């Protein structure tokens, strides 16, 4: 909404925030302020999905796909630190948190469902609700299990 307004009011490629009057920008009281993440990018410690394989692969010249051969590895360790992250969200004043469920964690092998992972996501949702934050779940955010990749994805 704001970006649309600013783009129309100030079509320059770069906006000079010192010259832009934002006092007339208002959001309705029902506007949902939130944050968002993708499981593989924040949870960390997941070597069972297609993105992990892509991070480890090299191009046709043998060069790592990612500068310095970096990887998401532990990422932000949201898997273990979600209680702290939820406190930060609460302090930020958001009302919603959109996150993804990592398919390769809940179904690491075809037809096998990891109850501990399902329980983990349930606990995280309950912690969000207890903090007054509405969980908004994305069931598939780009990554999928290696077994699914091997089937042709």
Describe the role of every protein-language-model region.
Residues 43-46, 86-153:
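Substrate-binding cleft and catalytic face of glycoside hydrolase catalytic domains
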